[in-house]
Regions:
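Non-catalytic nucleic-acid substrate-recognition regions in nucleic-acid-modifying enzymes
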Residues: 2-135
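A short, flexible beta-alpha/helix-coil linker loop
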Residues: 99-102, 158, 303-307
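Short beta-strand/turn micro-motifs composed of small residues
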Residues: 9, 257, 337
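Conserved S-adenosyl-L-methionine
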Residues: 173-290, 306-307, 311-313
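C-terminal catalytic and target-recognition region of SAM-dependent MTase-like enzymes
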Residues: 285-288, 292-371
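Residue-level signal for inorganic ion chemistry
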Residues: 21, 94, 141, 266, ...
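Class I S-adenosyl-L-methionine
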Residues: 97, 142-184
């Protein structure tokens, strides 16, 4: 079955996501803010959910059409091939978003789409009411500038939830963003990666998973595993490929923190992620870490706002780590923070700055390549 698939991501990660979709062997059709559309098949549903490191969800796209009125929304939805995917006993709830469009009431759009899907299903199955007791097919709509896109969610739980982080401290960085930051820092087998304010250890864990080629979704469940048109064999084959892809690596990462509770949590998460051979977790003050003659890269998400008492405390910390990290040169430094004036307090203008998002929170990745 030929499919159009949509992988969503945090704003700023579209390029990385597109590259890994192509690395899986699938053709990229289009890229807009927060989503990449690509062509695939049922196998692609399994492989993309299991392997994509930067995606938040993977959807099957049923179609797009102009919808400036409820009538257009109803007719456009009804014309799509819903019965090719959803059985007469299955559950099909509707949710979505409407942005910059004439149809701005989400509850009204939900009701119209639900009614249209029922009408399409009735035409195929010859019944007027549906028990909705079977497999769940979550329908998602996205209306932007009066263009409606209708999709079915194949992921279920968001893909950033790998399964290794059961608990977190404060406002943790999302796993997909941590993976992207780790990749941007260009980790290498012979260069130590150090997160000296590791919190729950996510950046170091994602870096180790990247270097070990551990597929992020290989040990979790997805909504589409219950879809009758895909089948268990495809999922079993995709998981087998995921485990076969893993390699040994001498890559080494340090995950340290001044907070003992954070260290305990990071140790637990490292074990659950299966990267304890690559990630060493210990108690340390970021303002006192030593290079000890090694080549290294600092990649960190320093506490700010919710993760620290006050903004002034955070700014004082930025000054102190700025002075200390520069003494570690020629180490490169990558800092992700939502503080809008980080460079001023850190004491040095970054060589490169990338705007990213941790969920809906705008952040900046400050990259320091040289002294």
């Amino acid at each position: 079955m030929k499919l159009q698939l949509v992988a969503t991501c945090l704003f700023g990660l579209e390029h990385l996501l597109g590259e890994e979709i192509e690395a899986l062997g699938y053709e990229r059709i289009s890229t807009i803010d927060g989503r990449v559309t690509f062509s695939g098949d049922c196998e692609a549903v399994a492989l993309s959910n299991i392997f994509l490191r930067y995606a938040e969800r993977v959807f099957i796209k049923l179609g797009s059409f102009r919808a400036e009125s409820f009538e257009e929304l109803f007719e456009g939805t009804r014309a799509l091939p819903w019965p090719d995917f959803i059985g007469k006993d299955d559950i099909f709830p509707v949710k979505g978003h409407a942005i910059k469009s004439k149809l701005h009431s989400v509850p009204d759009c939900q009701a119209i789409i639900k009614k249209a899907v029922v009408r399409a299903m009735s035409a195929r199955y010859g019944i007027e009411t549906f028990p909705e007791v079977g497999t769940k097919y979550q329908i998602e709509f996205f209306i932007l500038n009066d263009e409606a896109t209708l999709m079915i969610d194949t992921s279920g739980t968001a893909l950033h939830k790998r399964g290794y982080r059961k608990d977190a401290l404060g406002a943790p960085i999302r796993e997909t963003l941590a993976a992207a930051i780790a990749a941007t820092s260009r980790p290498r087998d012979n260069v130590l990666l150090w997160d000296p304010m590791c919190g729950s250890g996510t950046i170091a864990i994602e870096a180790a998973m990247l270097m070990r080629r551990i597929a992020p979704g290989r040990s979790r469940h997805f909504a589409a595993e219950e879809f009758s048109f895909i089948g268990k064999k495809l999922w079993d084959s995709a998981r087998e490929e995921a485990f076969d892809t893993e390699i040994d690596s001498p890559f080494e990462a340090f995950a340290s923190d001044i907070d003992g509770d954070a260290v305990k949590l990071a140790e637990k998460n490292v074990r659950l992620a299966g990267v304890e051979k690559n990630v060493k977790v210990f108690l340390a003050d970021a303002r006192k870490i030593a290079a000890e003659g090694r080549r290294g890269t600092i990649v960190t998400n320093p506490p700010y706002g919710e993760r620290l008492g006050t903004v002034k405390e955070a700014e004082a910390l930025y000054r102190e780590i700025g002075e200390h990290f520069r003494s570690l040169s020629p180490w490169q430094v990558y800092v992700i923070t939502s503080h809008p004036s980080f460079e001023r307090f850190y004491g040095k203008k970054a060589d490169k700055v990338r705007k990213l998002y941790n969920g809906m929170l705008p952040c900046y990745l400050y990259q320091y390549f040289k002294k």
